[in-house]
C-alpha cells in the first residue's frame, strides 16, 4: 500500500495504525504537496521508474473553499484546480496503462454531490468536482471490456477535517444541513461496495440521493432562481 499526502505526521500515524491491524501489510508513505507541480512530477516519475503494480488507485486528495468568487484568493483557486483536477488526472494517466495490460484494476475518484450542480459560494470547488464526475464517466466508457472499473464517489456533507479547512469567509466551518450529513464510516462502506459492484456513481445516504434526484428533475429556470435565492441568503448570513 502506498499513501500520499502533505502531512508527514498524519501519514506516519496512519501507517502505524494500519500495520498494527495488519502486521503483514507493507505500507509506504510519500509526503507530497499535490498543489506543487514539481512535487507531482517527482511522484509520477517515481511511479514510472518503479513500474508499480497498482491494483487500486484512490484519488482522495482534495481542496475546497467558500465565499464569493470575486473576493476569493487566486492562489487558493489555483491550488484547488491543481489538486482536484490536475493531480487526479495525472496520477490516473500514470497507472492506467499497466491496469489495462493486466486486464484488471480499479479507480475510485472522490468527487462530490456539489459536482452535479453549480454552487454559489463554492464556484471553483463545484466546477472541479464536476470535472471529476464527468472525467470518471468518460473514462469508464473508454475502459468498457478492459477489466478496469471506474467509480466516482459523490458524497454530500460529511463530518471530516475537510470542513474545518474549507471555512466560510466569516470563519465558520463549511458544514451542510444536518439532515444530509452522513457518517464517514458509512461513506467508506458505500464507496467499497460501489466499487466492488462496478457502479459508475455512488451517492452515500438516502437524503442526499433524494436531494440529487429532485435537483435533476427541477427545470433549469427554476433551479437558477433557487440558486440565486440561496446565494443571497448565504451572503446575508455571513455579514
Model-identified regions with their sequence ranges:
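Conserved glycine-rich Rossmann-like NAD(P)H-binding loop of the short-chain dehydrogenase/reductase
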Residues: 1-13
Amino acid at each position: 500500500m502506498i499513501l500520499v499526502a502533505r502531512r508527514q505526521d498524519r501519514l506516519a500515524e496512519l501507517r502505524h495504525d494500519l500495520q498494527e491491524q495488519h502486521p503483514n501489510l507493507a505500507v509506504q508513505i510519500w509526503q507530497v504537496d499535490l498543489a506543487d507541480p514539481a512535487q507531482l512530477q517527482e511522484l509520477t516519475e517515481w511511479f514510472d521508474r518503479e513500474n508499480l503494480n497498482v491494483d487500486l488507485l484512490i484519488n482522495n486528495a482534495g481542496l475546497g473553499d467558500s465565499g464569493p468568487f470575486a473576493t476569493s484568493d487566486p492562489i487558493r483557486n489555483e491550488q484547488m484546480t491543481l489538486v482536484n483536477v490536475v493531480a487526479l488526472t495525472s496520477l490516473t494517466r500514470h497507472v492506467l496503462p499497466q491496469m489495462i495490460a493486466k486486464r484488471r484494476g480499479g479507480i475510485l475518484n472522490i468527487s462530490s454531490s456539489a459536482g452535479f450542480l453549480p454552487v454559489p459560494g463554492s464556484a471553483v470547488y463545484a466546477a472541479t468536482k464536476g470535472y471529476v464526475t464527468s472525467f470518471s464517466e468518460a473514462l469508464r466508457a473508454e475502459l468498457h471490456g478492459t477489466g478496469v472499473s471506474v467509480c466516482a464517489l459523490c458524497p454530500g456533507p460529511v463530518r471530516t477535517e475537510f470542513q474545518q479547512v474549507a471555512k466560510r469567509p466569516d470563519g465558520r466551518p463549511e458544514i451542510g444541513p444536518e439532515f444530509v450529513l452522513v457518517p464517514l464510516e458509512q461513506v467508506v462502506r458505500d464507496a467499497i461496495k460501489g466499487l466492488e459492484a462496478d457502479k459508475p456513481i455512488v451517492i452515500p445516504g438516502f437524503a442526499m440521493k433524494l436531494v440529487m434526484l429532485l435537483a435533476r428533475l427541477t427545470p433549469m429556470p427554476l433551479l437558477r432562481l433557487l440558486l440565486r435565492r440561496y446565494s443571497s441568503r448565504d451572503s446575508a448570513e455571513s455579514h
